């Protein structure tokens, strides 16, 4: 703790098997521009560094800035920064307009089947979706085992042939269903769950908002069985 430095520093510095390789902090409220704790934490970090310097300790590296701090305050940059979201071309929601960014990732699949269902027929586990009229339902091989949140069922959308198409019914382990009644959709058509198609875009922030979560959780959920393809810009 910052208020225990006078007691703990002498004990740490007296240990023969320890050396100060780096000094760092991690901001609790960097993505909340109106929160006073950000400035207070930066002041306490400066006091801790001064306490070390007064005892002749010079750290090889000083770092504090995550993506949000990097965008809002150059005084946090020191000699290293720790961007997370920014590496993916994303920014914390409250700071989205500070820097022009282009998302560096997309999540895509393909339609594997298309079926016509009658009014009153259901789709998926627990029959959560019941058609109120004849509908055309497409199956996409992506589910919660890939990291898609189950709350996207009935809330989320995907892009197919440049159009937004709603996710219907429950998101299952390996598949989800979309209502493809608004236009032609066929097996093999590309489905964009995150990314751009036909001038429209499904963003990580949008997906997070639809499930009442945050961008970080959406990204961290994406599982290892998703095939990664790396493209040069």
Language model region names:
Residues 1-118:
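Active-site loop/helix belt of alpha/beta enzymes
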């Amino acid at each position: 703790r910052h208020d225990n430095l006078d007691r703990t520093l002498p004990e740490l510095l007296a240990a023969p098997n320890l050396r100060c390789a780096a000094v760092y902090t991690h901001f609790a409220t960097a993505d909340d521009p109106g929160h006073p704790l950000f400035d207070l934490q930066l002041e306490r970090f400066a006091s801790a560094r001064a306490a070390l310097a007064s005892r002749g300790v010079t750290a090889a590296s000083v770092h504090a800035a995550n993506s949000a701090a990097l965008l809002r305050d150059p005084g946090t940059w020191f000699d290293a920064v720790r961007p997370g979201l920014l590496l993916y071309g994303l920014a914390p929601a409250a700071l989205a307009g500070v820097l022009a960014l282009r998302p560096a990732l997309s999540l895509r699949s393909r339609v594997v089947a298309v079926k016509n269902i009658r009014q009153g027929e259901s789709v998926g586990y627990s029959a959560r979706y019941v058609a109120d009229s004849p509908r055309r339902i497409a199956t996409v091989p992506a589910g919660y085992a890939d990291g898609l949140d189950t709350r996207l069922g009935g809330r989320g959308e995907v892009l197919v042939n440049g159009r937004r198409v709603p996710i219907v019914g429950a998101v299952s382990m390996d598949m989800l269903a979309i209502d493809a009644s608004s236009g032609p959709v066929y097996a093999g058509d590309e489905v964009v769950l995150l990314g751009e198609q036909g001038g429209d875009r499904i963003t990580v922030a949008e997906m997070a908002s639809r499930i009442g979560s945050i961008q970080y959780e959406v990204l961290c959920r994406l599982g290892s069985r998703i095939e990664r393809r790396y493209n040069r810009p």
